[in-house]
Every structure is written in structure tokens, then in C-alpha cells.
Swiss-Prot record:
CDD domains: EF-G (cd01886), EFG_III (cd16262), EFG_mtEFG1_IV (cd01434), EFG_mtEFG_C (cd03713), EFG_mtEFG_II (cd04088). This is Elongation factor G. The gene is fusA. GO terms for molecular function: GTP binding; GTPase activity; translation elongation factor activity. GO terms for biological process: ribosome disassembly. It comes from Methylocella silvestris (strain DSM 15510 / CIP 108128 / LMG 27833 / NCIMB 13906 / BL2). Residues 8-283 form the tr-type G domain. It is found in: Cytoplasm.
Length: 691
């Protein structure tokens, strides 16, 4: 089956924003107006098409990014709806990795919020071109111009308006299109309401001309010929201006700003036009880099059907009807169902069975997928998030994704033997779907430990275990994921000697242990020359060191950011073995932890509290009482926004406390920022509790 659309007519884009900015509602309207959805789903009545997990419909937030294909003006739109809650940042990161562009939705009243900053940084990391849609222009307190200003001051973007609002709050009637210099006015707020072009209202003409002047002056910088014509008094025509805006978006030179109210059905069609006109197609983006498996050299994969096939898996989901679904993007070449391909990350073959195009939770079988397509594959055995699937004869590993470390953990105990068996299977599936969710076993108690990015993240996992997998279990209180690290360099000379008749055990190691840079991870290096430790025993040294990394000496927490260098040692021709060196290295590391000034580290969270002015003192005092460091405060409308760094250990149950002293009027967001040493007094309490 040939392509239905040329690759230059594809738009692979995501919709990203802070929680409650109206992201899912905007997507619902896009699906409605582009003809994919015949009944509009409202988030607040739990019927949105994109939010199809039970937990999402109840909580009114988007947890998993659902991929949807739809069409507008002859272009094929592959939309990824991403979650805005900070505990699900991993979902945003995964979807941005495979997108060519993004629509950043802002709440017209709230402006740039903490999670907006987070997703903006992630989009910067992957160089994702974007446009901004200032939503909720009908909301009380909506301020389009403040939102534009905050893009500059809070995320360092270069905003350029291509639309202006006509009215705001209950008087919001439509938009001014600065490219065509026309007003676009909606007749009413009903679904599918008609809209007409009109002349720009006289009272807004001067402002429209001022902002169009800024748009043109900024756009002509991108083309010398257009610039010189403009300096000679010739303004660019509509087509030229669109071409320049498209170029600006592609290279992230400036960010076009649009506005509307998705809920009131105003501004969605012009937003769709902007997606088609300005966001890049797969061929406008740089070729994806990979590593040739055979040679180890960097190679490029071009978005062409005739290139060798390569595809990146970016999401695993368990579907109640189809089983495990692997969402993947084809970067080069094409693939047919029934083909055997290579998972080059795992060096295992996979057979492509069913291939599905997804519309939220409806699905359509397809026989072939081409470069630029985003499809769901059913029945893959070994493929996980971040794995590459490719042509057997041209193996390549595409860029891998990086996932954050979990900062919070809970213990879970199944109530019966039957629950124990179900729990094991369910946790394996959940961990495969979400790389930021980890499962481990406590060595001493034998308890199963779940680790995640926040309380809500783990709440939802437990909810899924109970509802979807019918596991009945007791859940422990959330615990902080502390870490341990060395503070000084130590050199340890340790000899392991054991003689019990017959062959004995002998190994001597001299290892330098020192703190690595924060976040650099644990590193092992061998500097053995002259064979004082034969090379076949060196893996035993590394294994011994790694076995201690998982449990430090202070309170049994993982040891992080240590560099271990094997510099010398000794062996016996008969009594030395890999096991002997493993035991020696383990003992050496434990000694190093004793002598190297081990300290406890704790996760520090970036907290932003938005509160009416009356409660500012209470909020500040409470944060300081939680060992918080207030970084500053500013006004947002008539509310005060307080920024602070607070240890996670002191943030449990904060939401209830905040509600009680602000009568429910203050709210907060929190995200992991960094690890920091625990003060001595607090460290003693932690050690007493866990050691």
C-alpha cells in the first residue's frame, strides 16, 4: 500500500503545558474540527477522548500520552497529548524526543507556570520548534500581554505575536490575524460555531499596526533579499511573511504567539492553520544521529522511504484488548507487518505483527509504516522505551533517552499468596511501561519497594495495581529516597586470604576511592600495568565494588557519585580467583566508606506556592519551618507567588496543611531540583530510623 500523504505533508507535534492550562481540551477541539471526533469530550465531565485510562477520567488530568492521527488542509497531523503534571514529566520527555514540533498551551490567567518552564527546558534540550497558544482568554484575569512578556522573562524565549485578542474575559470575541491584517470573529460559543473575517475594530487598529510592525521587522532579519526590499519600503506579502515565520519556527529564532479559548470554541481553527503553516515536517528537521552497530561510527538516518529502516520505541502501554502496545516512530525507510527486524539495543530479533494507527483509544490496522509515521506495534517481546528497531542488514542504534532517578519510595505487601503472584507480573508490566518507575526488593526485610517521581505518581501506580490487575496489598507510608556519598579521597590496601585445606582464596587490591562530580554517577577504572592483577580478575573487582553501591554504611541507602580506581594489587598462582577479588574489593569499599567521610544526601524540591496576599506570612513561615529556603516572591495578578527550595522529607502532607491555613485558596507545585547533604542533626535522626 503506497503512502497516503507525502512526508512533507506530515506534522508530528505534541501539545505541552502546565496542568490545567487546557491542553487536553485544546486537543479535543482539534480532533473535533479536523473531523476525527464526532462528540466533543469535556475534561471536567470525564469524557475526553484522549484521556482514556480510568484514573485519568476520574482525576481530570492526562497521565499517559495518547497518540492520535488526524487531517487538516490536506496535511496529516500526528498528535501526541502529553501530561502536564510534574510527576509525569518522563512522559513529556519521551514524546518530545520523537516530535518535530510542539504547541505550548498557556493559561491566559496564570501565564508561564513551573511545569511550563520544565517542559520548555525539555523542548530546548531536544531542539523542538514550537508555537504558543495563549488559551482561556475568556477567563477572569486573562492577560495576553503579560503572558507574552513572561515567555521572555521566565523561559528566555523570543516571543513575536502573530495574533492579538479582541477583548478579554467575558468580552473575548475573536482574534486579529497580524499576517493577513484581518479580524476573525466567532458568531457564538456553540460547537462548530461559524467565524468570519472582518475589518479590524477601529479602537484596536493602532495596536495591530504596532505589533505587525514588530512581526515584520523581526521576520525580515531571516532573509537578506526581503530585508533590503523592506528597507526600500516594500513590505513582504502574505506568502513571504508565512515563509519567514516558518523558517523562524524551524530554527527557533523566535516563537509565534497565538490566542483563543478552546473551551469556548474560539481560535482553534486558526491554531490548526498555524500548525500546518509553521511547524516543520520530518524533512525540515535534521537527520537523526545513530551509531553503526558493526563499526561503532556515527551515522545519519535520513527521513526517506528508500533509506534503511530505523524506528525508535518511545512508549510501552498495556492495552486491555490488544495486549502490550509499543509506540514507535519510523525515522527512515519503511516496514511491513510480518517483517522480522532487529532490536539493536538488545541485539534481539523482533517480528512486527499488528501495526496500528491510534486515535486516542480507537485503533486502525495498517499493513505498512513509512518514514515519519507514529504507529503502535502489538506483541513485541523484548522492546522497551528508548530501544531502536532497525533493518537486520544495516544495524544502527539511534540516540538513547535519559531518564531521571526516582526520589520517593513506598513498600508494598500483597495480602495473599495469589496476590503475590499477580503483583510480580503486574509490576513487571508497569516498570516496562514507565522507566521512571522502579521496583526493587529490600535485602533485609524482603519487602517489595516501589520508587517513583512523586506521591501522585506512586498513588496512580497503586491504583492501577488494584483496579486493572486486581492486586490486594498493604501500602507503606512514602519514604524519601536518600543517597550516601564519600566526601574525601582515600586509598585502601586490602588483602583477602582464606586457607581451609586444599585450594585457598587470595586477592590483594589497592584501590583509590574519591568523590565524583555531583550527578556524574559511579565510575570504575583500572590502571593496572605489569599484571599485578591479571586482567581476567579485574571484572571481579568491579563486581565487588558495585555490590556495595546499592547499600551504604550509614543507613543502607545507595552510594552515588564515587570514582574507584584500581591502581595495584597482588595474586597467587593457585589460590586467586574472580570470586576472591570480588570479596577483596567489597571489603575495600566498605573500609573506604568508613574512612572517606560518608554523608547522607536528600532530594531538594523546587516549590512554588501561589497564594492570596493575606496568607503570604503564614506560607513563608511554614516553608521556613520545613527547612525551606525562600528564593524570592513576585506578584501574579493579585496573587503572590513564593519560590522556595525545600527538602522532600519535609513536604509530605503539605497540601492539607496549605489548604487549612489558606481556606483552600492557595495552591502549590513541586518538582525535584537536586540532591544536597543532610544537616548533621537531621542525618542522625535518619540513621536512627533506618540503620
Amino acid at each position: 500500500m503506497p503512502r497516503s500523504h507525502n512526508i512533507e505533508d506530515y506534522r508530528n507535534f505534541g501539545i505541552m503545558a502546565h496542568i490545567d492550562a487546557g491542553k487536553t481540551t485544546t486537543t479535543e477541539r482539534i480532533l473535533y474540527y479536523s473531523g476525527k471526533s464526532h462528540k466533543i469530550g469535556e475534561v471536567h465531565d470525564g469524557a475526553a477522548t484522549m484521556d482514556w485510562m480510568e484514573q485519568e477520567q476520574e482525576r481530570g488530568i492526562t497521565i499517559t500520552s495518547a497518540a492520535t492521527t488526524t487531517f487538516w488542509n490536506g496535511k496529516r497531523l500526528n498528535i501526541i497529548d502529553t501530561p502536564g503534571h510534574v510527576d509525569f514529566t518522563i512522559e513529556v520527555e519521551r514524546s518530545l524526543r520523537v516530535l518535530d514540533g510542539a504547541v505550548c498551551v498557556l493559561d491566559g490567567n496564570q501565564g508561564v507556570e513551573p511545569q511550563t518552564e520544565t517542559v520548555w527546558r525539555q523542548a530546548d534540550k531536544y531542539h523542538v520548534p514550537r508555537i504558543v497558544f495563549v488559551n482561556k482568554m475568556d477567563k477572569i484575569g486573562a492577560d495576553f500581554y503579560r503572558c507574552v512578556d513572561e515567555i521572555k522573562t521566565k523561559v528566555g524565549g523570543r516571543p513575536v505575536c502573530i495574533q492579538l485578542p479582541i477583548g478579554s474575559e467575558s468580552d473575548f470575541k475573536g482574534i486579529i490575524d497580524l499576517v493577513r491584517m484581518k479580524a476573525v470573529v466567532w458568531q457564538d460559543e456553540a460547537l462548530g460555531a461559524k467565524y468570519n473575517d472582518a475589518e479590524i475594530p477601529a479602537e484596536l487598529l493602532a495596536k495591530a499596526e504596532e505589533y505587525r510592525h514588530i512581526l515584520i521587522e523581526t521576520a525580515v532579519e531571516l532573509d537578506d533579499d526581503v530585508m533590503s526590499a523592506y528597507l526600500d519600503g516594500v513590505e513582504p506579502d502574505e506568502e513571504t511573511l508565512k515563509r519567514l515565520i516558518r523558517k523562524a519556527v524551524r530554527y527557533i529564532t523566535f516563537i509565534p504567539i497565538l490566542c483563543g479559548s478552546a473551551f469556548k470554541n474560539k481560535g482553534v481553527q486558526p491554531l490548526l492553520d498555524a500548525v500546518v503553516d509553521y511547524l516543520p515536517s520530518p524533512i525540515d528537521r535534521e537527520a537523526i544521529k545513530g551509531v553503526d552497530v558493526d563499526t561503532g561510527e556515527e551515522v545519519l538516518r535520513m527521513p526517506r522511504d528508500e533509506d534503511p529502516f530505523s524506528m525508535l520505541a518511545f512508549k510501552i502501554m498495556d492495552d486491555p484488548f490488544v495486549g502490550t502496545l509499543t509506540f514507535a516512530r519510523v525515522y527512515s525507510g519503511h516496514v511491513e507487518s510480518g517483517t522480522t527486524v532487529l532490536n539493536s539495543t538488545k541485539d534481539k530479533k523482533e517480528r512486527i505483527g499488528r501495526m496500528l494507527l491510534m486515535h486516542a483509544n480507537n485503533r486502525e490496522d495498517v499493513k505498512e509504516a513509512y518514514s515519519g509515521d507514529i504507529v503502535a506495534l502489538a506483541g513485541l517481546k523484548d522492546t522497551r522505551t528508548g530501544d531502536t528497531l532497525c533493518d537486520l542488514s544495516k544495524p544502527v542504534i539511534l540516540e538513547r533517552m535519559e531518564f531521571p532517578e526516582p526520589v520517593i519510595e513506598i513498600a508494598i505487601e500483597p495480602k495473599s499468596k495469589a496476590d503475590q503472584e499477580k503483583l510480580g507480573l503486574a509490576l513487571a508490566k508497569l516498570a516496562a511501561e514507565d522507566p521512571s518507575f522502579r521496583v526493587s526488593t529490600d535485602q533485609e526485610s524482603g519487602q517489595t519497594i516501589l520508587k517513583g517521581m512523586g506521591e501522585l505518581h506512586l498513588d496512580i501506580k497503586v491504583d492501577i495495581l488494584r483496579r486493572t490487575y486486581k492486586v490486594d496489598a498493604n501500602i507503606g507510608a512514602p519514604q524519601v529516597a536518600y543517597r550516601e556519598r564519600l566526601t574525601k579521597r582515600v586509598e585502601i590496601d586490602h588483602t583477602h586470604k582464606k586457607q581451609t585445606g586444599g585450594t585457598g582464596q587470595f586477592a590483594r587490591v589497592i584501590i583509590v576511592f574519591e568523590p565524583n562530580e555531583a550527578g556524574a554517577g559511579n565510575v570504575f577504572e583500572s590502571k593496572i600495568v605489569g599484571g599485578s592483577v591479571p586482567k581476567e580478575f579485574i571484572p571481579g573487582v568491579e563486581k565487588g565494588i558495585n555490590s556495595v553501591m546499592g547499600s551504604g554504611i550509614l543507613a543502607g541507602f545507595p552510594v552515588v557519585d564515587v570514582k574507584a580506581t584500581l591502581i595495584d594489587g597482588g595474586f597467587h598462582d593457585v589460590d586467586s580467583s574472580v570470586l576472591a577479588f570480588e570479596i577483596a574489593a567489597r571489603a575495600a569499599f566498605r573500609e573506604a566508606l568508613q574512612k572517606g567521610g560518608s554523608v547522607l544526601l536528600e532530594p531538594i524540591m523546587k516549590v512554588e506556592v501561589t497564594t492570596p496576599e493575606d496568607y503570604t506570612g503564614s506560607v513563608m513561615g511554614d516553608l521556613l519551618g520545613r527547612r525551606g529556603q525562600v528564593q524570592g516572591q513576585d506578584m501574579r495578578g493579585n496573587a503572590v507567588v513564593i519560590n522556595a527550595m525545600v527538602p522532600l522529607a519535609n513536604m509530605f502532607g503539605y497540601v492539607n496543611q496549605l489548604r487549612s491555613f489558606s481556606q483552600g485558596r492557595a495552591n502549590y507545585t513541586m518538582q525535584f531540583d537536586h540532591y544536597e547533604q543532610v544537616p548533621a542533626g537531621e542525618a542522625a535522626k535518619v540513621q536512627a530510623k533506618y540503620a
